[in-house]
């Protein structure tokens, strides 16, 4: 069995987030002052986690967020970030740069509702989901290949320290599962991956995990909580399990969804 952890973080706040302006892919807005503080708070929260791989969308707000996270890390300060366009936000076409209220008005005029409505030049939800699936399958193949190489050239079993570094910081509660499912007979994590992306993208990825992978989620979470947009720097953690040989889809367990305890005090205006 090959197991790995996937920690997904939304970028920090931008000025346009606060003003409820659609950014999508075409408006490459930097983080606001609050956004930088959120990224730093996320970094402090994750500072003891030993990530083996770090990926980010190639848009400015995610680049600045992942940098803010890693500069607080005890173990990952010098880690190379792989920027991937497949992690970009949903493309909103003509709605980019316009208020969210206008997007909702466009949807209403078309007899549809957000987020299912696709503005002209935008990306459909199915296209967004396929993009997320493509990245996830690439990631799985990368981890399986590296795990196979490590198994071939090293007699050492996967280390339990990757998992313990996660288990120590993610508190149990309403948004968290009760365990990482790591009993004595379960191998340690082969990898611990950090991904920094965007609100609509992460919501689509959650839908893929729920409907396609039949991922188990914390029982206390409602369907509406699973489909809501993550807060800025909200964190969602999955454990993926591949049976020996790595054939077929992995089984997936969600440890927590849109965790935001690290933001206590950060978002308060003085």
From Swiss-Prot:
Reaction equation(s) it catalyzes: beta-D-fructose 2,6-bisphosphate + H2O = beta-D-fructose 6-phosphate + phosphate
EC nos: 3.1.3.46
Sample GO molecular function, one term: fructose-2,6-bisphosphate 2-phosphatase activity
Class in the EC hierarchy, top level: hydrolase
Gene Ontology CC annotations of this record: cytoplasm; cytosol; mitochondrial outer membrane; mitochondrion; nucleus
Transmembrane segments: none
Domain of life: Eukaryota
Keyword Methyltransferase among UniProt keywords: no
Annotated compartments: Cytoplasm; Nucleus; Mitochondrion
Active site: 11, 89
PANTHER family per UniProt: FRUCTOSE-2,6-BISPHOSPHATASE TIGAR
Task of the protein: Fructose-bisphosphatase hydrolyzing fructose-2,6-bisphosphate as well as fructose-1,6-bisphosphate. Acts as a negative regulator of glycolysis by lowering intracellular levels of fructose-2,6-bisphosphate in a p53/TP53-dependent manner, resulting in the pentose phosphate pathway (PPP) activation and NADPH production. Contributes to the generation of reduced glutathione to cause a decrease in intracellular reactive oxygen species (ROS) content, correlating with its ability to protect cells from oxidative or metabolic stress-induced cell death.
UniProt name for this protein: Fructose-2,6-bisphosphatase TIGAR
The organism of origin for this protein: Bos taurus (Bovine)
């Amino acid at each position: 069995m090959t197991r790995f952890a996937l920690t997904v973080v939304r970028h920090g706040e931008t000025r346009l987030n606060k003003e409820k302006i659609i950014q999508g892919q075409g408006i490459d807005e930097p983080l606001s002052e609050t956004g930088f503080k959120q990224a730093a708070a996320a970094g402090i929260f994750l500072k003891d986690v030993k990530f083996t791989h770090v990926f980010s969308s190639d848009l400015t707000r995610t680049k600045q967020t992942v940098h803010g996270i890693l500069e607080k890390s005890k173990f990952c300060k010098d880690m190379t970030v792989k920027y991937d366009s497949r992690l970009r936000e949903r493309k909103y076409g003509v709605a980019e740069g316009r208020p969210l209220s206008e997007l909702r008005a466009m949807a209403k005029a078309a007899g549809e509702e957000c987020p299912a409505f696709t503005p002209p030049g935008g990306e459909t939800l199915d296209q967004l989901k396929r993009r997320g699936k493509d990245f996830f399958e690439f990631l799985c193949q990368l981890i399986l290949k590296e795990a196979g190489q490590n198994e071939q050239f090293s007699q050492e079993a996967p280390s339990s320290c990757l998992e313990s570094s996660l288990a120590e910081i993610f508190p149990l509660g309403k948004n968290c599962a009760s365990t990482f499912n790591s009993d004595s007979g379960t191998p340690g994590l082969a990898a611990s991956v950090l991904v920094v992306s965007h609100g609509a993208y992460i919501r689509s990825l959650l839908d893929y995990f729920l409907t396609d992978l039949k991922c188990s989620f914390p029982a206390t979470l409602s369907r509406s909580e699973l489909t809501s947009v993550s807060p800025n720097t909200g964190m969602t953690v999955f454990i993926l399990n591949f049976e020996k040989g790595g054939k077929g889809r992995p089984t997936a367990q969600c440890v927590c969804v849109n965790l935001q305890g690290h933001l206590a005090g950060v978002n308060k205006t003085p």
